[in-house]
């Protein structure tokens, strides 16, 4: 067995990970978290919350996983959320074209077109791995799970492919919550869905997975000189830039350069200080949850693999024994793509007013409504029309005035309804105004975390085989069970003392496990295997002087402390 198989065997035995729907044969791309796996995953998530909500000042929202078609049409997912597909002419089995090529030929398929993938399959005579048959031509496959809302299937929808869109849709409400003062950030943690063509990488490639995403909204002019960057500028990271990836004269080792974030920004490797800052936050989080620093690198997306919404993107990649480097975090500059797309398609104003350093004079349109005519025509919606006109930017106002002048009518789209405006409904004239600010569409820096992949890497990086034991060397932040409590023997009142201590630990918010079965060495080994950092033994000396033996997982060191100091000692260490 390789390391992956050993870890999966351990996680199944000890209640970390199980195949979903196992008694019905299972389905690829789905896993259940068992009792310890669920705690481990939640500890990863709660550590992430600490970094983004407590430390960074983001606030969390929770939106539906079912998303209407029009939302994902506007975001570009209907057109762009695809993978290349090949189907066998014989057995009709489907495969991801790029993966099937990489499994047969030592070549990088990232960013290749459908035609280029087709040529690779033909040139290398790649056949179906299941039956040996030939493939049909490479095509695209949309990865979203389609569904419908309500009876009759009249309202098309999808299971969300990312949590981010829920934040963008509620941008106006979120901005109001922050009193419309940039910059600010919102996060969402929850399930996302990707109908993978042929997931064959265990827990690495899932069809239902957990994302933790942050959306940091900022004035685009503030990205270059980002105030918080000063605190992380000297952080040194292993960077694999797009330029080095394309430099064929460099070896794989030479392509990765360790440098400070300040140098990376200064030399134009990282686009700006804002995205560099969240790369540093990502590294800090990964270190706290126990990722091996020697198995972490940050890789820049090449232009031909950049997401449709991104101006720059860096992946935190973690090394795994079986699958090599895998993408676990993406830190992207999404510009104002999403807000502009949803403004265009919803008719809602998603701009933010920002104050200028100095006042200045401008020319702007002033609208005067024919309230009698507008009230008679639009009745209760007249107020909606008035407010919508006030929110129009200069470009939209010019468009409206020109249409009324040349065509005598204009359709104003708002989130509530469309207004068919006639020339006689209003007058517009240009006036000079003193302005103290302007409306802008904020840009977005997005750190997006794949929690399931990260949780697996936490397990793999913690997994150690020693001569006489197997250890999950989890960091204290994420270990599922914090303390094992044992009576040395099941008599003389030791079980009662041990049980009482376990209860006190739990009352103080620490997950403690009582175990009185088998030799004490076997009990230590069981706790080592699930990553418990401390074990406490109640023995004969406890009955004499109220002291207990504490044993540390990693060093195996043992020492005694008074039983009434155990809770404070463990809490201090954790």
From Swiss-Prot:
Binding site for substrate: 96, 162, 209-213, 446-450
GO biological processes: glycyl-tRNA aminoacylation
Localisation per UniProt entry: Cytoplasm
One Gene Ontology term of the molecular function aspect: glycine-tRNA ligase activity
Keyword set, alphabetical order: Aminoacyl-tRNA synthetase, ATP-binding, Cytoplasm, Ligase, Nucleotide-binding, Protein biosynthesis
EC number: 6.1.1.14
Principal location class: cytoplasm
Pfam families in the record: HGTP_anticodon, tRNA-synt_2b
InterPro entries the record matches: aa-tRNA-synt_IIb, aa-tRNA-synth_II, aa-tRNA-synth_II/BPL/LPL, Anticodon-bd, Anticodon-bd_dom_sf, Gly-tRNA_synthase/POLG2, Gly_tRNA_ligase_arc, GlyRS-like_core
Binding annotation for ATP: 194-196, 204-209, 327-328, 450-453
Tagged with keyword Protein biosynthesis: yes
Function: Catalyzes the attachment of glycine to tRNA(Gly).
Protein's name in the database: Glycine--tRNA ligase
Originating organism: Methanococcus maripaludis (strain C6 / ATCC BAA-1332)
């Amino acid at each position: 067995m390789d390391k992956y198989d050993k870890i999966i065997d351990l996680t199944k035995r000890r209640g970390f990970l199980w195949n979903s729907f196992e008694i019905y044969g299972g389905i690829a791309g789905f896993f259940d978290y068992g009792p310890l796996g669920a705690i481990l995953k939640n500890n990863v998530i709660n550590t992430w919350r600490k970094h983004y909500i407590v430390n960074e000042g983001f606030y969390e929202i929770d939106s539906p996983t079912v998303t209407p078609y029009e939302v994902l049409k506007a975001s570009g997912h209907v057109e762009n959320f695809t993978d290349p597909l090949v189907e066998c002419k014989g057995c009709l089995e489907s495969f991801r074209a790029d993966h099937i090529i990489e499994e047969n030929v030592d070549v990088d398929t990232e960013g290749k077109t459908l035609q280029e993938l087709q040529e690779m399959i033909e040139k290398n005579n790649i056949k179906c791995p299941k039956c040996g048959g030939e493939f049909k031509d490479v095509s695209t496959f949309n990865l979203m799970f389609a569904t419908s809302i309500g009876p009759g299937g009249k309202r098309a929808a999808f299971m969300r492919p990312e949590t981010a869109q829920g934040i963008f849709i509620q941008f106006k409400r979120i901005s109001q919550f922050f009193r419309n003062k940039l910059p600010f950030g919102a996060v969402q943690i929850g399930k996302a869905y990707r109908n993978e063509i042929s997931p064959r990488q265990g827990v690495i490639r899932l069809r239902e997975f957990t994302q933790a995403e942050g959306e940091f909204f900022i004035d685009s002019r503030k990205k270059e000189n980002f105030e918080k960057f000063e605190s992380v500028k000297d952080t040194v990271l292993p960077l694999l830039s797009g330029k080095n990836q394309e430099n064929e004269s460099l070896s794989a080792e030479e392509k990765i350069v360790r440098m400070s974030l300040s140098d990376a920004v200064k030399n134009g490797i990282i686009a700006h200080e804002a995205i560099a800052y969240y790369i540093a936050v990502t590294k800090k989080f990964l270190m706290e949850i126990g990722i091996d620093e020697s198995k972490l690198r940050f890789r820049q997306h090449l232009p031909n693999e950049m997401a449709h919404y991104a101006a720059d993107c860096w992946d935190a990649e973690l090394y795994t024994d079986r699958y090599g480097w895998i993408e676990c975090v993406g830190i992207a500059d999404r510009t104002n793509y999403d807000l502009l797309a949803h403004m265009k398609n919803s008719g809602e104003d998603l701009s933010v007013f920002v104050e200028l350093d100095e006042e200045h004079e401008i020319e702007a349109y002033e609208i005067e409504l024919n309230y009698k005519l507008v009230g008679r025509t639009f009745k209760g919606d007249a107020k909606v029309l008035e407010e919508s006109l006030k929110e129009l930017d200069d470009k939209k106002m010019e468009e409206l005035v020109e249409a009324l002048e040349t065509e005598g009518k204009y359709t104003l789209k708002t989130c509530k309804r469309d207004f068919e405006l006639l020339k006689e409904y209003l007058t517009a004239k240009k006036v000079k105004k003193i302005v103290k600010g302007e409306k802008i569409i904020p840009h977005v820096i997005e750190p997006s975390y794949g929690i399931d992949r990260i949780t697996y890497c936490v397990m793999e990086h913690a997994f150690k085989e020693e001569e006489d034991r197997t250890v999950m060397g989890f960091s204290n932040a994420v270990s599922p069970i914090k303390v094992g409590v044992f009576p040395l023997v099941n008599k003389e009142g030791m079980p009662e003392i041990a049980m009482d201590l376990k209860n006190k630990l739990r009352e103080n918010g620490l997950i403690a496990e009582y175990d009185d079965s088998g030799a004490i060495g076997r009990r230590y080994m069981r706790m080592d295997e699930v990553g418990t950092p401390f074990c406490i033994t109640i023995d004969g000396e406890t009955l004499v002087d109220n002291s207990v033996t504490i044993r540390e997982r990693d060093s195996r060191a043992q020492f005694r402390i008074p039983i009434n100091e155990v809770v404070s000692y463990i809490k201090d260490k954790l």
